[in-house]
Amino acid sequence: MNDAANSIATIVATRVFSPTMAVLWAAFWNFAAIFIFGVSVAHTMGEGIVEASRINEYLIFAALIGSVIWVWLCTHFGMPISVSHALIGGLIGPVWFTFGSDALVASGIIKIAVFIVLSPLIGMILGFFTMCLTMLIFRRKHPLKVEGLFKGLQLFSSAIFSLGHGANDAQKTMGIIAILLYSVAGSNTFVSEYLYENTGSFHVPVWLIVTCYSVIALGTIVGGKKVIKTLGDGLARLKPVQGFCAETSGALTLMGTAVLGIPVSTTHTITGAIIGVG
C-alpha cells in the first residue's frame, strides 16, 4: 500500500487527481500490468535467489517472520526501509543458516544487490535528463500553458508508473507463494491436484498470477488513500512538469527491471527520480 501511494503521490501533490480518484487510477493500472509483463521477477524470487529444491514451508515461515520483525523494528525507530529487500534478506538468511552458501544462487543475489544501489541512481539520472530535456523543449512557452499541458500528461506518466509498480511488486509476492507451493506439491496431494501441478520444475500457475495482481490492486484501493494523501501533501511544492518527469523516469526504471527479472524497491526508485528532477 505504501509503494502504491508512492506510485501516484505526485498527481495528488500537483492537484491533478483527488486522493480517491488517484488510488482508483493506480489500482486499475496495477492490475493492467498482468496483460503486459511476464513473470520474470517471480522466477527470480522463486529460483534466482536460493535453490528452489532446498525450500520447505518452515524456511518460508522463517523468512516471513524475519522480514516482518525487521520491517516493524525499522518502522518503530523511524528508519527508511524497503519491504522488498527485507523479504529477500529474510529468504536468504534461513536458507544460508540451514544449508550453507551452496544453496544460494550467487548470480541472482549479486544482481539484486547491485540494483539496490543502481535503481535509485538510474531513476535520479533519468529524472535529471528528462527534466533538462523538457525545460529545453518548452523554454519559450508560457508557464501557465506548460503547467496545464503537464497536468494532462501526468495522467500518462502516473499510469505507466503504476504499471511498473504492479509488474514488480505483484511478482515478488507470487514468487514467494509459488516457491512455497513448489516445495509442498510433492508431498501434499491437495496442493498437487488443485493448486500447483507437480511438473518437477518451478513455475508460476495462472491462478496465482491473477490473484496476486488482483490483491495488489485491491490493496491500493483499500489502504492507499490515507498514505497517498499524506505523501501528496508532503510533496506540495512539486510542479506538474516535475511530477511528469519523475514518474516517467521512475516508470522506465521499474519496467526495465521487471523485464530483466530484477526485484527493486518502488520507493527507492521514485525517490531517486524526484531528487533528479530537483
What is each model feature region?
Residues M1-G278:
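Multi-pass alpha-helical transmembrane bundle typical of ion/small-solute transporters
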